[in-house]
Structures are given as structure tokens and as C-alpha cells.
Design a protein with these regions (language model features):
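Histidine/acidic-rich helix-loop-helix segments that form or flank divalent-metal centers
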Residues: 163, 204-246, 260-264, 270-390, ...
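Amphipathic alpha-helix face/heptad-repeat signature
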Residues: 131-135, 188, 240, 318, ...
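Membrane-cytosol interface segments
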Residues: 1-98, 366-444
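Acidic/His-rich, divalent-metal-binding segments that scaffold phosphate/diphosphate chemistry
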Residues: 63-193, 197-212, 302, 410-411, ...
Length: 444
């Protein structure tokens, strides 16, 4: 697939990055828009050829005309899963409890029926190994959830494949965006969200691709409460498969962000998941909670008793920041709500705000009693206090997404009255200044 003539498509750029170490050859004649052969089959693909092809409109997308000499095929994929199970303690505990070997083998065989997917997953492995590993985890977790829900074998293998390929649209995003190390701007965050639609578009061109998988790829960032994207769909509008993939993806994102560096088990996810039970449909939520609770996870402390006073001081400062941001953001949304246009971004904003509001009310972390409980610093409460670090990180992340959404509405002048746009600008500036002024006050 090429962009405008004269420019290398993002996916083709990935191919040019890997072709020196991982040979690619032309499997069928490449023809221009008029049907004339411009590159015969059998030739090796390289940067010079890619640049030459970029000057032409092709009859078939380039990805349909090439073959990677070393593919992550069904057999290789199964080997990679075995390696993950042997080396990752959390997945090993899951695997020992749920015995998914037979279903896993069938699922890998199903994946092997789609040559273009094998090509793209191979490129993902070489170009974005961290994302490829996440794809393995997401596929495995999705399969476990489907099994827990008593899905039949055909449904299970489809859920597995959707979990494996849910992020292939990222291969077609601008490389500068994908490789960015620091935080996305609101505009870049919005551009990244298009990977769901790109992924679904790719799958629609693949023969015999089950429609349920295409729908799941499109919906895996939608949320049951309407706070997701790309269409802010909610409730019964959403398919179960997309909810399963979304739940697995969320668990792995939370684990990578908040738990992996602390070497905690998946059981540490439970307090975070229970903050937002309405994000996913009830049966999917209960399935993942059941999967986690059925495993005897080893209990682990993060800090020594002697260091807990500093931990509590740091948490109290974090709590203060959450209270401040919530007050500003909630006040902003209440103020602009009657004037919001009727579109998907406005629906997302309302639903996300409501979710955060209920989350904070349910958790009780803004209550005086919560802070007094922390200040009491009873040794028997230390383990629970430690886990607040994870809960606070999730709440702060959710509020950061809300800030980005408000920034998009402001920068795109979605509000007709200039005073309302000024209110958003002022509120976002106020939050930024608060955190800038309090950096030095943090206790390490």
C-alpha cells in the first residue's frame, strides 16, 4: 500500500528497514495502474526498488506482491508462546491453572491461514519487538477470557487472532509518531487513535477474514460506558469480542505501566479494575476478575517498614494533586457541558468525566477519612497503603486523557463562545502550573 505517488508509504518504510537483514523477494510480477509489468517476480526488494515503485500507481498493493524469506508462521508463533510461558512467571501461573495448550495450538494454526497477517506480524516483530510481545500477551489473555466465558472452539480461535493482530494498524502510522519517546501532544494522541480504523481497513481486504474479527479490531478501544474511541459507542452497540480484546489490552497496559517494574503479580490489577467496573460489559469484567482470583498469587511487599513514612508522605502529595486536578477538570466540564457540540468527541468527554467522577466517589480517596487512615500508618495497613500507588497512577492517567480531550476541543475551537475556550485554556494552564510548582515539594 503506497501513499501519494513519490512518497514511501509508512509500511513500506518498515520493509526497507528490515530487508537488509531479513531478505524480501518479489513473489508476483508488480504492475502499474495500466497493467504493465514494472518489476518481474523473483527480484529482491530493497530501498532503491521501493523508491522506484513510489513513482508509480500500482495495480496491487506492494504488500500483496512480496514474500519475506523468514516468516513468523504458525509453527514459529507456537514456539514463541512456549518461550513466553517458560520465562514469564505470571503467564506461567495462568498456563498451569488453565491448560490452554490444545486451544493455543489450534489458534496458531488458524493464524497460519492468513499469509498477509503472517507478513505483518513478522514486520512487527522486527520493527517493534515490544509491541509484538504485547500482542502475544494480549492474544493469550484474550484466549483465556474466551475460554472462561465458555466460548466454542471457533469463537476462541477468532478471539485469539483478534488479540494477536489488534494493533497492526500501527504499522501504517507515521514513523515519527510511532517512535516518539516523550508524551504525545493532543493532536498526536488523536492521530494514534486512528490505528483501530486502519487495522479494520487492512483486514477488510483479506479474503475469508471473519467479520467478527474486523469488528473487534475496530472496537477494541471502545468502552461500555461510551468513553472510548473511535466512535464513542456504548453498551449493546458493542460486540463481545472487541470487549474481550479491550480488556486484555487494558490489563497488559496497566501491568506494563504500573506493575512490571515492581515485579508484582496480576492480582495487583484487581483494585484498578474494580475502580472502573462499568468500562467493559459485565460478563467480560467478571471473567477477568475470576481468572485472576482463581490463582494463588504470592504476596509481595514493595517497601520496607522503615521507608513507609516517606511513601505515605509521597502518596499524600499525590492525593493532593489528584484533588486539585479533579476540582478544576470537573468544574470545567460542568461549565462547558451545555455548550458542547453534538459530536463524538463531546460524547467521549461527558462519558469520560462521568467515569472519573464515579471512580473517585467509589474509591473514597478524596475523603478526609482516607487521608487520616494513611497518616495513622498502622503496620497492618502497610501492604494496602503500598497498593494505593498503583490506584493513584491509574486515576492520574485517566485525568490526563481527559485533559488531552479538553485540549483538542479548545484547539479545534469546538466551542462557539470565545469565553468558554478561554475557560478551558485557563483551566489547563492552572493544572500545568500547579504541577510545575509542586515538583520540588515531592518527597522521594
Amino acid at each position: 500500500m503506497l501513499n501519494d505517488v513519490g512518497h514511501l508509504d509508512c509500511y513500506v518504510q518498515h520493509l526497507t528497514q528490515i530487508c537488509a537483514e531479513h531478505p524480501i523477494h518479489i513473489e508476483v510480477d508488480i504492475c502499474n495502474g495500466q497493467g504493465a509489468v514494472i518489476v518481474p517476480k523473483g527480484r529482491h526488494f530493497d530501498l532503491a526498488l521501493a523508491e522506484r515503485l513510489s513513482e508509480h500507481t500500482l495495480q496491487e498493493p506492494l504488500e500483496n506482491c512480496i514474500q519475506l524469506d523468514e516468516l513468523v508462521d504458525a509453527q514459529k508463533l507456537m514456539q514463541l508462546f512456549k518461550a513466553v510461558i517458560e520465562t514469564d512467571q505470571n503467564i506461567a501461573l495462568f498456563h498451569e491453572r488453565w491448560q490452554l495448550n490444545s486451544l493455543l495450538a489450534k489458534s496458531c494454526e488458524f493464524y497460519g491461514q492468513f499469509p498477509l497477517l503472517m507478513q505483518k506480524m513478522t514486520v512487527l516483530k522486527y520493527e517493534m519487538p515490544h509491541l509484538f510481545k504485547q500482542a502475544l500477551f494480549c492474544a493469550y489473555t484474550s484466549l483465556a477470557i474466551a475460554r472462561r466465558l465458555k466460548a466454542n472452539r471457533d469463537e476462541c480461535v477468532c478471539v485469539f487472532l483478534a488479540g494477536l493482530i489488534h494493533d497492526i494498524g500501527i504499522l501504517h502510522l507515521d514513523l515519527e509518531l510511532v517512535t516518539k519517546k516523550d508524551e504525545y501532544t493532543p493532536e498526536q494522541w488523536q492521530a494514534m487513535q486512528s490505528h483501530t480504523q486502519l487495522g479494520a481497513k487492512i483486514l477488510k481486504r483479506i479474503p475469508n477474514m471473519p467479520p467478527s474479527i474486523i469488528k473487534a479490531i475496530l472496537e477494541h478501544h471502545e468502552r461500555y460506558d461510551g468513553s472510548g474511541y473511535p466512535r464513542a459507542k456504548k453498551g449493546m452497540e458493542l460486540g463481545t469480542m472487541g470487549q474481550i480484546i479491550g480488556m486484555a489490552d487494558t490489563c497488559l497496559a496497566l501491568y506494563k505501566r504500573d506493575l512490571h517494574s515492581k515485579k508484582l503479580g496480576f492480582d495487583a490489577l484487581l483494585p484498578i479494575l474494580q475502580l472502573n467496573p462499568g468500562i467493559y460489559c459485565d460478563k467480560v469484567f467478571k471473567a477477568i476478575v475470576g481468572l485472576i482470583k482463581d490463582i494463588p498469587w504470592p504476596m509481595k511487599r514493595l517497601y520496607s517498614d522503615e521507608s513507609m513514612p516517606k511513601v505515605v508522605s509521597r502518596l499524600l502529595l499525590t492525593n493532593e494533586g489528584i484533588t486539585h486536578d479533579y476540582s478544576v477538570l470537573y468544574g470545567l466540564v460542568v461549565s462547558i457541558n451545555p455548550h458542547l457540540p453534538k459530536n463524538k468527541k463531546s460524547a467521549m468527554l461527558r462519558n469520560m468525566t462521568q467515569r472519573i467522577h464515579f471512580c473517585l466517589q467509589r474509591s473514597g480517596i478524596l475523603q478526609r477519612e482516607h487521608k487520616e487512615w494513611m497518616r495513622a500508618q498502622k503496620k497492618e495497613d502497610y501492604a494496602a497503603i503500598e497498593r494505593l500507588e498503583i490506584m493513584y497512577a491509574e486515576i492520574r492517567w485517566q485525568m490526563k486523557q481527559l485533559r488531552k480531550l479538553l485540549a483538542i476541543l479548545w484547539k479545534k475551537h469546538q466551542l462557539k463562545h470565545p469565553q468558554l475556550n478561554q475557560e478551558i485554556q485557563k483551566g489547563l494552564w492552572q493544572i500545568e502550573q500547579y504541577h510545575r510548582n509542586h515538583i520540588g515539594a515531592k518527597v522521594h
